[in-house]
C-alpha cells in the first residue's frame, strides 16, 4: 500500500495535478461533484447517521445479551439466528424469475433472457474465485452475474443487487459508444441498491417466516454501512493529501477516523 500511494502520487504529479485526489476522482468518473461536496456529505453522515447507528448497535448488544459488542459480533443480529433463504439455488432462481415477471414486463423479459442463456454462475465450487459481481460481455450484448451462494441472505441479495446492475446494463446494451453502457461508478449503485428495495414485497417467498428479520437486517445493514463507507473515503483523502506519511502515521490516522465514524 505504501508503494501504491507513492506510485499514484508520481502519476498525478507527472500529469500536472497537485496530488492523486483529483486524478483519482477522474479515474472513478466523479464528474459532477468534487472533494468539497464529498466532505459535506461526510459531515452529514457524521451528524445524522452515526448517532442512529450508535442506537442500532446499542439495541443489538441488548438484544443479544452481551456486556460488550465486539467487532466479530456485529454481523450476528438475532439470538435465533440471522435470516437465510429457505430454498435451494435452483428454486431461488425460479422464484426470482416469477418475482421479476410480476414486478414489470421489462424486468421479466430481462430475467428470462438471463436464465434462458445461462448468464448466472451462482454455485460455490472448489477453486472458484470468491465474491460476486455483474459484468457485461460486449460481443454478446449480455450481462453476466457471478456469485458464490452460501445459504445466507447474501444469496437473495445477489438476485436483487447484482440483478439491478444487470438490468441496467441490459437496458443500455444498445448504447454506443460502448463506454457509455455503464454509468459512472457511484451511479451504478443507484440501480443495484434500488432493486434491493423494490423487491421487498416478494421477499416472503424467499425467507418465509423469517421475512421480517430479513427486512430489519437488510435495512439496518444499509444504514450501518454509510459511516464505514465515508470512513474509507475520508482515510483515502488523508493518505493522498499527505503521501509522505509513514505506515505508523497512516495507522494512527485510520484509528482516529475510526473512532469518529464508528465510535461504538
Indicate where each model-derived feature is located.
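Cation-handling catalytic/transport regions enriched in His/Asp/Glu
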Residues: 1-264
